[in-house]
Structure formats: C-alpha cells, structure tokens
C-alpha cells in the first residue's frame, strides 16, 4: 500500500493535461488539489462544467501504433496507465482506424474517476494568482487561459515568454523535398549564430509560376475564425493569403523576396520569387515554410503549396494555421522536466507548453505528473528516451526546437507528434530486390514505432535507473 502525504500538489486547469497529471500524482500516493474555474467562470469555448471537456473534435486521431505517430503515442500512454486513454477506450464510437469518442461519456468518465479518488480534491474556482504557500504547482490552463491568470503568468515568466496568437506555418518532412530543385543558401550568404551561410532551403519561382501561385492563394477556400478567436490581424503575423490579396507584388517584397539569393542550379538566371524553408528541429528532419502562416483549408494548403517548385511531392508534418492561443516560449524558460527555470516549484503541462492536440496535451500532463511525483518523493525524475513518442514530444518542447533568441517574437511554435520529431532510424537492410518507395516508407515507420515501444516499456520498467535520470541540481 502506498504511503500518503499531507502537503498537496496544486494543479490549475481541469482539461486533459490537468486531469491526467492529477491522476498520475494521486496514483503515486500524493494528495492533489485540482483547481477548475468552470462553472464559476466560463470560457468562450466550453459548454459544460465537466472536466476534460472536448471543445472541438471528438477524435483522438489515428489509433494505429505501428505506422502512425499519434497512434504510437496512444500505445505509450496506455502502457503508462493513462486515465485519458482509459476513458477514451471506454467511450469509443465507430471511426474506422481513428479513435473517436462519445464526448459527453468521455468527460463524465474522467470527471467521475477524479471525483471518486480519495486523494483528489476538486475546487471549482478561478485561480488569479499562485499562492506563495503552494510548494508544488502544475499549470495546465490550456489555450484559453483566463485573462486574469494570463496576467499572472506574464508577471512570472516575463512578457516575451507568453504568446496569445498562434502563427503557424506549414512544416515539411525534409526527405520529401526535391533537392534537385531546391538549394541551400542564407540570404546574402549571411552567417548567423551557429550558422554556415547555407541555413535555408530555397525554392525558386519564375514570373509565370509566381503569378499563378498568387492567383491560387487569392481564390482558395479559407477557414473562418471562430467567435472566441476573433482578434485583429497584425502585420507581423499576416496570413499569406491576406498578403496576396493586398497586391500582386506584395509577397515578392515580403516572405517570397528573391534578393540576396542565387540559384545554385542556374546561377545566371535570377529567380523572380523564392520560397524559403528553415530547419525546424535539431535533427534536420523537418523544415518550415518561412512566413507562410495561413488560414487556408487543409486540402487547399496541400494543393497550392505543392505548386511550388521543389515541393511537388511535399509531405506535411503539420499544416499551417492562425488562431488565438496561449503558450509559453518553452525551450527558453522550461527545463527538461517542465519546471520553470527561475521558479522550480512551478511546472507547466498541456497545450500551454507548446504541444498541439488532445493526445499530446494529455501526454505532457502525464509526464508533468510523473516528474512532480518523483520529485515530491525525493527521487530524480527520469526522462523518457527521445526514441519514444513521449521523449520526442518532450524534447521538442524543452530543447529540440531551434531557438532564435534575437527574434522579436518567439520562434518556437506548437507542434503535433509526428515522425519528424524522432531521431533517425538506422538504415534498414533488405534481402532480395529493392523495395518500392511506399513499402520502404512503411518499413521505416514500423521500425521507428517498434523501437519506441520497446524503449518505452524499458523506461517504464526502469524509471528509477540512474542512467536515465537527471541530476537533482538540473
């Protein structure tokens, strides 16, 4: 029987991350006080007072753990005895290969489990500031953090650490870019911090290609803002389709300007316009489209962005978007166990850390809960291997993203789990004839997921191992 303790861990926010963190902590014998502002104070998106309410879709996306990154994350969470996954499995509805749930049944299951846990106290109140008497705190307030608490977070983290508008550009798998068309070069061959003068991939367009591209953007189907997202555009974060509507030459003097770039494959012909791709993770497996934040519908993004020379066969790890959000510049202000570097009794979990999606949010809540419980028990939190979905996602949030500390706005952007976040797999050797491209990609995914599940099982079984632990002074 687990020993119980007197001092509680306070968790602010009863969404997926806060609920999962509460469960993981309580299951380790530690009392939890879960603070949820609803129904005392409503948000613009929630409709009920239930915990873990699914505000948008009822889908947890693909449940295939052998060939899909989010399905792999499902499997790892089940191995870690996730409450969120248990509730999802108990409330499944038909959805093909996806895991979709009865949203009301799901929320009721989570709420009931937490209300009936002897070590969890739920306080229905808005937290406007973090009490100095609270020794252990996890903040999991999500993208719709209340204005009052957002001000508290600004004061704690620093104004540059918090963003309130998601400017998301598409991200592309590097191995799907045509390197016979695109070339590496920084504008004017400028060498920045840790740069080489060849830090961008460049996609050239001639005049006809550029004008066709602009026309396609202007005529594309666009997603409208939801009522609670309505915020004026600001010039530093204009959707690319809005720029296209401002005039034929606007993009060519903005994110698609060709100045300072020479086509390595055709140096005597100056590109009329250039789309630049910037490395998005330290592994170099992902590149983002610079300045291409957008509200185009997903299908339109794929169709139109594949018109760009070199991206005809582009595979997208994430498509673009622009919507209201509240998230931290996590790689700068959080340590590897999700603690605030300058105030280590405070952890963050869920979407506010810079992950996207129901499952990702719950997974980071699970990790934050386990890290907090280990620390509470005076044990060293053990990091999941980066080869696991847990570790890949955590690494993106706390260190895998390339940081531009001189940028006016944080360069860090929220991310779903995807195979581009994982370390490359060792080359797969096949006996006999060469595999077709599709079969080779499938085999690669299967190898990554098999490695991940094996490493996750080992991590869960050996989580107190010194070899996978951080120093207590980290």
Curated annotation (Swiss-Prot):
Principal cellular location given in the protein's record: cytoplasm
Enzyme nomenclature, EC number: 2.1.1.74
InterPro entries membership: FAD/NAD-bd_sf, MnmG-rel, MnmG-rel_CS, MnmG_N, TrmFO
Residues the entry annotates as binding FAD: 13-18
A GO molecular function held by the record: tRNA (uracil(54)-C5)-methyltransferase activity, 5,10-methylenetetrahydrofolate-dependent
Location within or outside the cell: Cytoplasm
Catalytic activity: uridine(54) in tRNA + (6R)-5,10-methylene-5,6,7,8-tetrahydrofolate + NADH + H(+) = 5-methyluridine(54) in tRNA + (6S)-5,6,7,8-tetrahydrofolate + NAD(+); uridine(54) in tRNA + (6R)-5,10-methylene-5,6,7,8-tetrahydrofolate + NADPH + H(+) = 5-methyluridine(54) in tRNA + (6S)-5,6,7,8-tetrahydrofolate + NADP(+)
Gene3D superfamilies the record matches: FAD/NAD(P)-binding domain
Function summary: Catalyzes the folate-dependent formation of 5-methyl-uridine at position 54 (M-5-U54) in all tRNAs.
Stated family: Belongs to the MnmG family. TrmFO subfamily.
Protein name: Methylenetetrahydrofolate--tRNA-(uracil-5-)-methyltransferase TrmFO
Annotated organism of origin: Bartonella tribocorum (strain CIP 105476 / IBS 506)
């Amino acid at each position: 029987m687990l020993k119980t303790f007197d001092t509680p861990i306070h968790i602010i926010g009863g969404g997926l991350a806060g609920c999962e963190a509460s469960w993981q902590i309580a299951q380790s014998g530690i009392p939890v006080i879960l603070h949820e502002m609803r129904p005392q104070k409503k948000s613009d998106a929630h409709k009920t007072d239930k915990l873990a309410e699914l505000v948008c879709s009822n889908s947890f996306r693909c449940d295939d753990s052998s060939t899909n990154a989010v399905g792999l994350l499902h499997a790892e969470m089940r191995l870690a005895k996730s409450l969120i996954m248990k509730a999802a499995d108990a409330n499944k509805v038909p959805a093909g290969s996806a895991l979709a749930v009865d949203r009301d049944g799901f929320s009721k299951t989570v709420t009931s489990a937490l209300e009936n846990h002897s070590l969890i106290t739920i306080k229905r109140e808005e937290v406007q500031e973090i009490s100095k008497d609270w020794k252990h705190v996890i903040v999991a307030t999500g993208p719709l953090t209340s204005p009052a608490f957002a001000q508290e977070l600004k004061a704690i983290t620093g104004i540059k650490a918090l963003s309130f508008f998601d400017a998301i550009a598409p991200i592309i798998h590097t191995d799907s870019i045509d390197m016979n068309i695109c070339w590496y070069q920084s504008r004017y061959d400028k060498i920045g911090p840790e740069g080489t003068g060849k830090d961008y991939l460049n996609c050239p367009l001639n005049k006809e290609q550029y004008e066709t591209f602009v026309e396609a953007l202007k005529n594309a189907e666009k997603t409208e803002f939801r009522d609670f997202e309505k915020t004026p555009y600001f010039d530093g974060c204009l959707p690319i389709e809005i720029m296209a509507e401002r005039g034929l030459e606007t993009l060519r003097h903005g994110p698609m300007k060709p100045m300072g770039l020479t086509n390595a494959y055709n140096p005597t012909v100056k590109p009329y316009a250039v789309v630049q791709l910037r490395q998005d993770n330290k592994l170099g497996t992902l590149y983002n489209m610079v300045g291409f934040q957008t509200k185009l519908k997903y299908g339109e993004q794929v169709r139109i962005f594949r018109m760009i020379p070199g991206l005809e066969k582009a595979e997208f790890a994430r498509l673009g978007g622009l919507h209201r959000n509240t998230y931290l510049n996590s790689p700068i202000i959080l340590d590897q166990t999700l603690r605030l570097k300058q105030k280590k009794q405070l952890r963050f979990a869920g979407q506010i850390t810079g992950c996207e999606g129901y499952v990702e949010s719950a997974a980071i809540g699970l990790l934050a809960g386990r890290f907090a419980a280990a620390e509470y028990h005076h044990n060293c939190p053990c990091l999941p291997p980066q080869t696991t979905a847990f570790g890949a996602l955590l690494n993106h949030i706390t260190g895998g993203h390339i940081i531009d500390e001189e940028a006016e706005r944080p360069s860090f952007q929220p991310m779903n789990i995807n195979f581009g976040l994982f370390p490359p797999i060792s080359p797969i050797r096949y006996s006999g004839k060469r595999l077709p491209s599709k079969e080779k990609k499938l085999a690669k995914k299967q190898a990554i997921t098999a490695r991940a599940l094996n490493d996750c099982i080992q991590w869960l079984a050996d989580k107190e191992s010194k070899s996978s632990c951080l120093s207590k002074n980290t």
